[in-house]
Amino acid sequence: MIQGSYRDTWTEVSLDAIHHNVTAFKNHIDHHTKLMAVVKADGYGHGAVEVAQEALTAGADYLAVAILDEAIQLRDAGIDAPLLVLGYTHPDGLKTAIEQQITLTVFTKEDAEQVKIAAELLQKTARIHLKIESGMNRIGIATKEEAVEIAKALHSSFVMLEGAFTHFADADNTDPTYTEMQFHRFNQIISHLRTHCHIPIVHCCNTAATIAYPDMHLDMVRVGIGIYGLYPETHLKELIDLKQAMSLKTKPVYIKTVDQDTAISYGLTFTTERKSTIATMPIGYADGFSRLLSNRGDVIVHAGRAPIVGRICMDQSMIDVTDVENVGLDDVITIFGEPTEGYIAMEEVANLMGTIHYETACLIGKRVPRIYMRQSEAVNYKGLVEKEPVTS
């Protein structure tokens, strides 16, 4: 039983791996370049507070999240490091952001004017980064003239225009053409903007670009997926050594032997072709163990693979352990983990789902406890029920 949960299903997050990955990126960039650790989406499912704390300990200079709510969560946890909200912030949130020294992204003149008004009313400094559109075509300032206009709209003794950034759409592609075009377009706007105002921090590199394009690192790089030990694309693995931080584990709750031609689970999509040993696991698609893995994926038991059989249910799922000797109720089943330790990589699971491992990590639900490990020992725990972080 996992102490802190009444169900033997959990994730382990290696803080050593997080630390290793941040250090690897710090060593990969010039010592003058800052490292921004992206911990949005609850740290890509790993736990934003815990990852942020470890990343800062390992040398990260700045943090980033997607929305103001995530930033407030970090501030409430006592994290006072520089912190950027990468996306849009509603005017209703400006007062809170300014008071908590949360840096905001601005990409329209209207937003700039709202920020200026809020800061001057509070008589407190608003920290701002401009978002530049260079080819992602999501949000951002598209022209150099518009960039200057917005910068002027922000002009106030209570507004600090701290930075400007863009986001690459195709940096994980082996063909650099589009990324180079974006970089050139971004630099054109920044060069023009800097003739009108001072911008201390300019940044454009995501994880893929940080690994593959050292000439684009500029003042700061933004590393998200790489901090968690996951590569944007396979070809980048030879350029930096990362360790997958998250593993997903469970234990069987029931093991039985069934005859040949026995149907398993909803829809009768799997029928045994021989007398088989079937183990039921207390994990299902409500936990992020996707139904798309039904009859497709494998898990690791006793260092061997066992196939997932039948449709994955909301709370339970079944595996065929016929070819794995002596499986018992106390045996740990690993759904994914660090591949160098003999486990199935999250990337493989994502490929079977027809998606990317970014999504696979984020899908792991809140009712699956996160156990934080250091040197193979549990040091912290986060789950629906707060208890001591002890495994057995």
Curated annotation (Swiss-Prot):
On whether Isomerase is a keyword of this UniProt record, the answer is yes
GO annotation, cellular component aspect: cytosol
State whether keyword Repeat applies: no
In the Enzyme Commission scheme, what number(s) does this protein have?
5.1.1.1
Indicate where the modification N6-(pyridoxal phosphate)lysine is found in the sequence. 40
Q: Name the Gene3D superfamilies for this protein.
A: Alanine racemase (3.20.20.10), Lyase, Ornithine Decarboxylase, Chain A, domain 1 (2.40.37.10)
Please tell me where substrate binds in this chain. Answer: 138, 314
Catalyzed chemical reaction(s): L-alanine = D-alanine
Show the InterPro entries listed in the entry. Ala_racemase (IPR000821), Ala_racemase/Decarboxylase_C (IPR009006), Ala_racemase_C (IPR011079), Ala_racemase_N (IPR001608), Ala_racemase_pyridoxalP-BS (IPR020622), PLP-binding_barrel (IPR029066)
Question: Which biological process, per GO, is one annotated for this protein?
Answer: D-alanine biosynthetic process
Enzyme class label: isomerase
What Gene Ontology molecular function terms does this protein carry?
alanine racemase activity; pyridoxal phosphate binding
Q: Which UniProt keywords apply?
A: Isomerase, Pyridoxal phosphate
Active site feature: 40, 266
Q: Which cofactor does it need?
A: pyridoxal 5'-phosphate
**Domain of life (superkingdom):** Bacteria
In the record, the note on similarity to other proteins reads:
Belongs to the alanine racemase family.
As for what it does, the entry says:
Catalyzes the interconversion of L-alanine and D-alanine. May also act on other amino acids.
PANTHER family, from UniProt? Answer: ALANINE RACEMASE, ALANINE RACEMASE, CATABOLIC-RELATED
Q: This chain belongs to which protein, by name?
A: Alanine racemase 2
The organism named in the record is Oceanobacillus iheyensis (strain DSM 14371 / CIP 107618 / JCM 11309 / KCTC 3954 / HTE831)
Q: What is the lineage of its organism?
A: Bacteria, Bacillati, Bacillota, Bacilli, Bacillales
